[in-house]
UniProtKB/Swiss-Prot annotation:
Reactions catalysed according to its record: Na(+)(in) + 2 H(+)(out) = Na(+)(out) + 2 H(+)(in)
Function: Na(+)/H(+) antiporter that extrudes sodium in exchange for external protons.
Gene Ontology CC terms, in alphabetical order: plasma membrane
Organism for this UniProt entry: Streptomyces coelicolor (strain ATCC BAA-471 / A3(2) / M145)
Gene: nhaA1
Primary subcellular site in the record, as a coarse category: membrane
Membrane topology annotation: Multi-pass membrane protein
Keywords from the named record: Antiport, Cell membrane, Ion transport, Membrane, Sodium, Sodium transport, Transmembrane, Transmembrane helix, Transport
Protein's name in the database: Na(+)/H(+) antiporter NhaA 1/4
Gene3D superfamilies assigned: Na+/H+ antiporter like domain
NCBIfam families: NhaA
Biological processes annotated in GO: regulation of pH
Localization annotation: Cell membrane
GO molecular function, one term: sodium:proton antiporter activity
Length: 410
């Protein structure tokens, strides 16, 4: 096997991709707080792109809205496969991560507001900061520490974090964004409808188009247009990635040997793991702590910490357990409630959506600095605690697998 093939194969491993993501985040944090921080800010704020299309964006924005959309496409695509062929095909199992996501959105916001009332209402506008889960970082931590965890737990996390993030983005778009371009939003919806029809349509016309035009030439430009329209409408452009992933066809047709869904994942996963996610982490995780002198005494610091570290755990676990007891929904037999507790702690990782929400809601630079510092501290704490819990559960599942293997050979 050639060196490029070995690298590509390695990048299809979640553990390798997760390690690259975490490593890039550490480099960004050190760089942003080093004597060379000015070079980091200069790189992150450098703008490029076609101004005529209103896409003359900073490197940071291209990474957060553009490259991250590729990762969200892969997540949506993987969820589509699970909905059609796998774990989420059973509504009783799909209901639990969705209930966890709804609890993981609502409870952190309520906890934030409760702490805000206790501090006299200061920084109440930041209630949306703890609502979202940093899915890229959460999946990375799970991949690195949970190599022996059951596969359904990863599906649970993907479903939870995707619904969580999309719910948070939509809530913030309605509550905190006044400049939504509904024309661009409508055109994006039309583009998504065309994308879905070309993927899943069964008529002669669409079959002829798919036969005559190479898939990459048909869908890549269309996806770029949909992404640009979603970006122009003022809603987080990564939503376009998730929706297009969910619209992918998961069954081959005609002479196809593999479905478009599996073919797209085969091509894009190494790019996402090796380029998109590390660059996103490098451009997004560099939170400067300069000027955070009042960090410890700031109300928003404790509000964010409480929302992410307490609200997420209570919301995710509190959304899952009652649902399983009061309805026909149930966990996969391979999972235990200790696994879900680890995922609930992992949900306290912010970053992906929390940082943009902090920028939208902060009323001063001091508030923004404190909010970013709190997101960083909460995310690091959640990642370390989840690593301990899930690492222990991974060893537990490894022992169970060994015992089962020994029993099978005797």
């Amino acid at each position: 096997m050639s060196a490029p093939s070995r690298i590509t194969a390695a990048l299809r491993s979640d553990a390798v991709g997760g390690s690259l993501l975490i490593g890039a985040a550490v480099i960004a944090l050190i760089w942003a707080n080093s004597p060379l921080s000015h070079s980091y800010e200069a790189l992150r704020s450098f703008t490029f792109g076609p101004s005529a299309l209103h896409l003359n964006l900073s490197v940071e924005t291209w990474a957060a809205d553009g490259l991250l959309a590729v990762f969200f496409f892969i997540v949506g695509n993987e969820l589509k496969q699970e909905l059609v062929h796998g774990e989420l095909r059973d509504p009783r199992r799909a209901a639990l991560p969705i209930a966890a996501a709804l609890g993981g959105v609502a409870v952190p916001a309520l906890v934030f507001l409760a702490f805000t009332l206790g501090s006299g209402g200061e920084a109440a506008g930041g209630w949306g900061i703890p609502m979202a889960t940093g899915i890229a970082f959460a999946v990375a931590v799970l991949a690195v520490v949970g190599r022996h965890l059951p596969t359904p737990l990863r599906t649970f996390l993907l479903t939870l974090a995707t619904v969580d993030d999309m719910s948070a983005v939509l809530v913030i778009a309605v509550a905190c964004t006044s400049g939504i371009n509904f024309t661009a939003l409508a055109l994006a919806a039309v583009g998504l409808a065309v994308f879905g029809y070309l993927q899943n349509g069964s008529g002669r016309a669409v079959a002829r188009v798919r036969a005559m035009v190479p898939a990459w030439l048909l869908f890549v430009p269309l996806a770029a247009v949909v992404w640009a329209l979603m970006h122009a409408c003022g809603v987080h452009a990564t939503i376009a990635g998730v929706v297009m992933g969910l619209l992918m066809r998961t069954r081959p047709q005609g002479a196809e040997r593999v479905s478009p869904s599996h073919r797209a994942e085969e091509v894009l996963r190494p790019f996402s793991a090796g380029i998109a996610l590390p660059l996103f982490a490098l451009m997004s995780a560099g939170v400067s702590l300069a000027g955070a002198g009042g960090f410890v005494t700031s109300a928003i610091t404790w509000n964010v910490l409480a929302g992410l570290l307490v609200g997420k755990v209570v919301g995710i676990f509190g959304g899952t357990w009652p649902t399983s007891r009061l309805t026909s929904a149930h966990l996969n037999p391979l999972l235990g409630w200790a696994d879900i507790a680890g995922i609930a702690v992992l949900g306290g990782i912010g970053f992906t959506v929390s940082l943009p929400i902090a920028e939208l809601s902060s009323t001063s630079q001091a508030h923004l600095t404190d909010a970013k510092g709190a997101i960083l501290l909460a995310s690091t704490t959640a990642a370390l605690l989840a690593a301990l819990l899930l690492g222990r559960r991974s060893r537990h599942h490894q022992r169970l697998a060994r015992q089962a293997a020994q029993q099978a050979t005797t």
